[in-house]
């Protein structure tokens, strides 16, 4: 029996957190947990440059809880599939010595935790949850999706990205190739995993591929998990230090996932203009490597614990990682990435008009009928019942014209044009 869905397309995870639909799955109750704000990190990843140390990373269970909300909002995973990600992360972390928090951060950066994420190819086939180097694990081979995604395949995806493949390094190899403090080696490993190398300057915001990659990962392990990074690709390479110098914390040789995080801080980091780009005890130690971010991917985070932060005198207090009840979400760009789109409660607004032909500005939903004659652009606050009522078609017709829509209509993409007549 079909039940009208209340999952919507909107622009901010904070709206989703405040308006979970009735009958939502139990993991949505995690919305009361705090999420850290984003702080742009530039330079070489070392604590001396203001990057967070291992002691400033959030605990794994906190990170998992916050990112679980984003996975639910961004993907078509079943509860079992999402649970299998959690189980596999901890298992592979134990086998490889790679910190479970780091593995989770890379998964969220690369695929937003969507088990049926498509592969990408920029000269190398990047597959699965971690977009590994020619990995064997995938539940979306050549556009053919596997549902349900077997737990063994989910484990294989995480194995490929963490331990490496026959064709390329994983996180473990990337980590072991680095020097410096434990946390810095992770940030450097993240950059290597993304681009294959680090710029000769040592600045993690320079070089190829995604310039903000290391900054994003440093924020993720610290408790941020937003939809869109507040780091600016065009300028991050000019920044030579982080914004967290005022925070204490040793960067010892061992990493522990039970460490506390900065709680109340003196001042939140100023938001930066955004740019877009594609479990029990966590196991820690030394891990890590490589690939470019996929076109289909999804993000949001956690924080909060015991330690209090210090306040500076005279000069303005340094920006710090302040826990916040609402995730910082950047404004949507002109070409939003589908899996990064979050859904929220419907707004009481009039329905936007449908267009008789594809718009030149809004992107087409990739699974729309190839013979489509009329389109509708999804607006903030839209949900399937609202769209079908506005354009005068049934939900079954909407699905037949846009085969990518699931039966619960849980994956409307904000800003995309859907077919409403063929």
From Swiss-Prot:
Boundaries of each LysM domain copy? Answer: 374-420
Keyword set includes Glycoprotein: yes
What GO molecular-function term can you cite, just one? chitin binding
List, as start-end ranges, the regions of compositional bias called Low complexity.
Answer: 253-270, 289-319, 330-360
**UniProt xrefs under SMART domains:** LysM (SM00257)
Keyword annotations from UniProtKB, A to Z:
Chitin-binding, Glycoprotein, Signal, Virulence
Cystine residue pairs = none
Q: Which residues form the signal peptide?
A: 1-19
Q: Where are the annotated glycans?
A: 86
Similarity remark: Belongs to the secreted LysM effector family.
Q: What is known of its domains?
A: The LysM (lysin motif) domains are small globular domains involved in binding chitin in eukaryotes. LysM1 contains one LysM domain.
Q: What else is known?
A: In plants, chitin acts as a microbe-associated molecular pattern (MAMP) that is recognized by lysin motif (LysM)-containing plant cell surface-localized pattern recognition receptors (PRRs) that activate a plethora of downstream immune responses.
Protein name per its UniProtKB record: Secreted LysM effector LysM1
> What organism does the record attribute this protein to?
Penicillium expansum
